[in-house]
Amino acid sequence: MLRQIKRLLENVPHSMGVTVVNPLQFLRELFTINGAGTLIRRGSRIDVHDGWQSVDRARLRALFASAFGRDIRDDFFSRPVARTFVEESYRGAAVVAETEVAPYLTKFAVERQAQGDGLGTEIWSLVTRDYPAFFWRSRPENPITTWYVKQCDGLLRFPKWHIFWRGLPIETIGPAVQHALAAESDFG
């Protein structure tokens, strides 16, 4: 049975899940939040690019518009970045810039239709693999802020921004917070 599931998942373009459930528990699986089966899921292919090289900027711009509900600034792609992590169908991405302080996660986005699929966690695991120490910011009203709180080692709350960090030495936290507060907006 696992071989059949593997073949099925290999032939679909996006991440997809298959639930294996006992027939007696089928209704519970369908109609409750706490399912009764075992979920088997194919992961997404995440491409890692140095800088903006080989990134389809138009598709990335569309992803940001879908995820954030507003357009990215025209000069966003002229800013230097160290690495971009992009799901093969541009349903999710992360952008990391090098700063004088530490790596800065400037964008982390999953398109609205893919939110809840685990894609963000897949991208996040690659970012944290490549960057064990970095910082980022989020608007207080951002719905993902509570997830960020679980991922960070620390945070400071300001009226306009919440500043998060992970793996930073204590002497770097102050300069990282100052950098994040001073960074210009990515949206027009």
Question: What kind of feature is each model-predicted range?
Answer:
Residues 1-102, 106-121, 125-126, 130-134, ...:
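C-terminal catalytic "cap/lid" subdomain
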Residues 140-163:
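Conserved active-site alpha-helix within GNAT-family acetyltransferase domains
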Residues 136-138:
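Conserved hydrophobic beta-strand within the GNAT/NAT acetyltransferase core sheet
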